[in-house]
Amino acid sequence: MDNIPQSINPIPAFYCCYLLRSTVRHASLYIGSTPEPSRRLAQHNGDRTGGARKTSSEKLRPWEMVAIVSGFTNRAGALQFEWAWQHTKESRHAEVERCESEQLGTRGSSRTGKEVKRAGKPRTSLPNILENLHILLRSPYFSEWPLEVWFFSADVWQVWSQPKGNLLDNSIKVVTAFSSKEAGDTNRREILGKRIETLDTGYDALIEYVEKSQFLLESEEAIDCGVCKQRLNPRNDMIAICSHSLCRCASHLLCLSAHFLEAAGFIGKLIPKEGTCPACLGKLEWPTLMKEITLRLRGQEEVKRLLGRRRRTEQVGKRKISNHVSSEKGESEASMPSTDAKTMALPIRSHPSVGGSNFGKLGRSVGSAIRTNTDNGSVKAVTPEIEFYRRRKCNAKKNFSGLYSTPRINISDWDNAEIIE
């Protein structure tokens, strides 16, 4: 679609509400919202500029992020949930029973039998805050949102898991990101910080999805809606593409929404949470489809930046592979036996009958690879292996002639000379 105003931003890649707890005083808790949990946690701990007044006390630092609620499609929705989580009693989304249970209760006195006022749970206690979260996620308003709850601390998860009456809707995912061995770990803050840093808060997971959609819609191929079978107009229609890499199914957004709601039995609602592709029957999540559509139509600059970064990453990877292959090739060539006689050291085995002088001649003959032809003055290269083999071949003879033979004594002519008296 070409009539989308460029001032409208795509759906944020990530936005969450979070729960902080002081590692010094566990009773001190804080609720906030952010698109970048790792950066925000560093601000609260004073490692970066920013933060909040309630978390600025050095007596309470460092803070740890023990739970988050993610899946918000815009900043306004996250701020709305944050306020409702902080002021559940005043929120119109909380159940009436919750408001009544927070009022001061009564109990009978064991001495007089009269009813006396009993103080309720502190509003800022961990069980109270998690109970408020449970109530909001069960409310008719927020239960329709595609929210996920993440827990990074085992003890907080245990408090959450305690019975709270009604159950959550199955569509709300609850994720535990901790191990059972972390309770007494001295590096707890470092472990939690690393877990927060590993959260996927960008569009990197969608870039291949957007590339496939652009290639499919920008081609000259005629495409029909996967639901109503009518011809799609990429310039005017809001089109949703299947998120599975091998599926080319495209549908009108309203057609696909109606298909999902009808299959789930949610007649009368407008926004589904998930469904199955009409073509490949694969599971599709509605927030993922909407993120891709808004990123493709409203975030062209972001798509260009992501594609450029990915190409640079691929080029760096190719260079590393090329350098690694070249280094391995060089090492293999260096490990091969060299044919240069000047650097070659062949093992020379001596025979028991070989004297020291003859052994030296053999070594010099092997070490010399270049000889000069005295007849024509040309240089003749002699392979050391061949020269060595020729001289060792004489070693098989019993009389050890040649280099290994015993020195011959020439008979002088003076032996036959006539003696003159």
From Swiss-Prot:
Predominant location category: nucleus
GO cellular component, one term: Slx1-Slx4 complex
Subcellular localization(s) per the UniProt record: Nucleus
Entry's Gene Ontology BP terms: double-strand break repair via homologous recombination
Record's keyword annotation contains Cell cycle: no
Names of required cofactors: a divalent metal cation
GO molecular function, one term: zinc ion binding
Pfam families noted in UniProt: GIY-YIG, SLX1_C
UniProt region (Disordered), positions on chain: 34-57, 96-120, 310-339
Keyword Nuclease: yes
Keyword list, A-Z: DNA damage, DNA recombination, DNA repair, Endonuclease, Hydrolase, Metal-binding, Nuclease, Nucleus, Zinc, Zinc-finger
EC category: hydrolase
Zinc finger regions, SLX1-type: 225-280
Residue ranges with Basic residues bias: 310-322
Matching CDD domains: GIY-YIG_SLX1 (cd10455)
Enzyme Commission number, as recorded: 3.1.-.-
Alphabetical list of PROSITE patterns matching this protein: GIY_YIG
Residue stretches making up the GIY-YIG domain: 13-95
Family the entry assigns: Belongs to the SLX1 family.
Summary of the function given for this chain in its UniProt record: Catalytic subunit of the SLX1-SLX4 structure-specific endonuclease that resolves DNA secondary structures generated during DNA repair and recombination. Has endonuclease activity towards branched DNA substrates, introducing single-strand cuts in duplex DNA close to junctions with ss-DNA.
Subunit structure: Forms a heterodimer with SLX4.
UniProt protein name: Structure-specific endonuclease subunit SLX1
Organism of derivation: Ajellomyces capsulatus (strain G186AR / H82 / ATCC MYA-2454 / RMSCC 2432)
